[in-house]
Curated annotation (Swiss-Prot):
This is Putative acetyltransferase BSU40680. PROSITE patterns: GNAT. The keyword Transferase applies. It comes from Bacillus subtilis (strain 168). Could catalyze the transfer of an acetyl group from acetyl coenzyme A (AcCoA) to an acceptor substrate and release both CoA and the acetylated product.
Length: 147
């Protein structure tokens, strides 16, 4: 398993296909809500692809909001879950943020995945709320050891 930063339009398109498969087709999110102004190669987000045996099976993005790294659109194709790739993705996103001298992180995690994020040091920081018909919570993490 490995992760790489997306640097080509082809890889960005691959990431979009993974997001479409997970969020739109599997979870029923409206496609109009899945893609936004941050989905560009040279914008404010850094996108990544996660690979299992050289096959792209997961993706995510991260952007800096204020003095916090906001982890977004974390997803893995269904048949590749439960192999530790989620931790690999989150670790990679956190490294990207730390490279910019920032040690605070946040994400809107699906409530059913909150336990996973808690194991990685995140804490629930909000009441449950709905995004695209799916329950979410705000989760935050401070990692001062990174600086």
């Amino acid at each position: 398993m490995n992760v790489k930063k997306i640097t080509s339009e082809q890889d960005l398109h691959t990431a979009f296909e993974i997001r479409k498969a997970v969020f739109v087709e599997e979870q029923g999110c409206p496609i109009s809500d899945e893609f936004d102004e941050f989905d560009t190669l040279h914008g404010d987000c850094q996108h990544i692809l996660a690979y299992h045996q050289n096959v792209p099976v997961g993706t995510a993005r991260v952007r800096i909001v204020g003095h916090t790294g906001k982890l977004e659109r974390i997803c893995i194709l269904k048949s590749y879950r439960k192999f530790g790739l989620g931790k690999v993705i989150v670790d990679a996103l956190e490294r990207i943020v730390k490279e910019q001298g920032i040690s605070a992180f946040k994400l809107h995690g699906q409530t059913q995945a909150a336990g996973f994020y808690e194991k990685l040091g995140y804490r629930t920081a909000s009441e449950e709320f709905m995004l695209d018909g799916i329950p979410h919570v705000l989760m935050t993490k401070q990692d001062d050891s990174a600086l």
